[in-house]
Design a protein with these regions (language model features):
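LRR N-terminal entry segment and analogous cap-like coil->beta motifs
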Residues: 82-125, 140-141, 146
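Structural alpha-beta junctions
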Residues: 56-67, 120, 183-185, 203-207
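Extracellular beta-strand solenoid repeats
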Residues: 101, 118-120, 124, 134, ...
């Protein structure tokens, strides 16, 4: 840590941060000679989605070259070229390595990530105001969490989830359009469909 501080003091490493109105940091950058080597959210995790536009704006304004933590800036590299995940040609498909955290971002719809054919990580869009899952990646190798939204359909959900699929605390009355394959737990508790099934099971036991 001591040698790291010396590099900062000597200007060899520059540290920048995106802060809220109370001065609390939510995104931290490490830059060396105009090249961005780190972009971290809290606890060294991927930054929250709501900060992505600000992150991309800072990188563009400062003209930093993105060397590491590419996915944390919502970019990715393909065939040596850098692409913006929010502005990717829709006639192409790609894979994305890393988790995507869109939770608690005041979203009413997902950014269109439907051309992500495989996400090597987990996808979290919980705690928003989503009424649809349109725009979801096609396959998730980790977990998929869309709980605590206002979903009344699972239309647009990934075709395959290798981890768990959590759609609890929504307004689902049917489970049509759910992923074709869920390899782990499928949690749809605290939805009207769960209550309907409970009542139906009670009726079946009485007959």
């Amino acid at each position: 840590k001591g040698s790291y501080d010396i590099y900062v003091q000597n200007g060899m490493i520059e540290i920048y941060s995106i802060r809220d109105k109370n001065g609390n940091p939510h995104v931290t950058f490490e830059v060396r000679n105009g090249k961005m080597h780190q972009c971290k959210g809290k606890q060294n995790k991927m930054p929250k989605f709501k900060y992505i536009p600000a992150i991309q704006k800072v990188i563009q304004q400062q003209k930093w070259e993105i060397i590491e933590d590419v996915e944390n800036t919502f970019h990715f590299k393909k065939n040596g070229k850098l692409y913006n995940l929010l502005d990717f040609p829709k006639n192409k498909v790609f894979t994305f390595k890393g988790d995507i955290d869109l939770s608690h971002s005041n979203l009413t719809k997902l950014p269109d990530l439907s051309n992500v054919v495989m996400l090597f990580g987990s996808f979290n869009c919980s705690g928003n105001q989503l009424s649809s899952l349109e725009g979801s990646p096609q396959r998730i190798l980790g977990d998929f969490n869309c709980s605590h939204n206002v979903l009344d359909t699972l239309k647009g959900a990934p075709l395959k989830v290798d981890g768990y699929f959590d759609c609890s605390y929504n307004n689902l009355t049917v489970l049509e359009e759910k992923p074709q394959t869920i390899r782990n737990n499928f949690n749809y508790t605290h939805n009207p469909i769960a209550l309907i099934q409970t009542i139906q099971n009670q009726k079946n036991r009485q007959t």
